[in-house]
Amino acid sequence: MRLRALATAAAIALTALPAYAHFGVLMPGSELVNRPKTPLELTLAFCHPVEQNGMNRAKPEAFDVWQNGEKTSLLNTLKETQVLKHEAWKSTFTVTRPGTYTFAFTPKPYWEPAEDKFIVHYTKVVVGAMGDEEGWEKPLGLPAEIVPLTRPFANWAGAEFRGRVLFDGKPAPEGTPIEIEFWNGSKAKLPNDYLITLQAVTGANGEFAFTAPFAGWWGFAALGDAPKMAKDGKMKDVERGAVLWTHFTKVPSQLAK
């Protein structure tokens, strides 16, 4: 019981971070697919989700889907689009059979002059199809990855979500920062800037937990470092991020009583 209490305390230690976090975005048209041969729209972007400020997203180096242990490249399906008036990408994937579909992209490094560093966010989302829920907890083997410990789709707002951060296949060190934002499509104004980006830290074994206070799409970005890269003849820092998006469903009023 004592070990469990310590792990829980470390995992849910939330603070507010008055900074404007960058997020890789991988947003499906729906978190669930209920019928076969349903086209699923996917949007790939790079932005500040709460502030709804975009940055240009060059075409990713890789874009794949995993289903039943099989990996399929979707890179050639990408078409250029715009998100928040900036370069982004879109794809349509047809779901043909029941399963858990995990989509992920590897971006080209993004140079952020304001922070004098490169940013590389390995971004993924999981979609459930036709009642199947096998395999959502399996790691993909990305250089940086959030592996869900709670099913990452079909969750109520107010339910706890848990995940484990892996860097190069190993649990992230205790205290690894995790930035948390929601997709603020309505551009709602927040009471103060501290609420723009929430922050958690990993506990033992790279684990963390978060309870979404309201429904919608929420993104988690676990941040670490990667080997330096050259920029104009100088070696620069690289922020390596593991990003996971998941949706929380509003609890109907008749169930909330």
Language-model features, listed with the residues they occupy:
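Mid-chain, structured segments of secreted extracytoplasmic proteins
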Residues: D64-P113
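Beta-strand-rich domain onsets/edges
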Residues: H22-E41, D116-T176, F182-S186, K234-K257
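Short amphipathic, basic-aromatic surface patches that mediate peripheral association
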Residues: A45-N53, F167-G169
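Short, acidic Ser/Thr/Gly-rich low-complexity loop/linker segments typical of extracellular
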Residues: K187-N205
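Short, surface-exposed beta-strand/beta-hairpin micro-motifs centered on an aromatic residue
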Residues: K90-F93, N205-T211
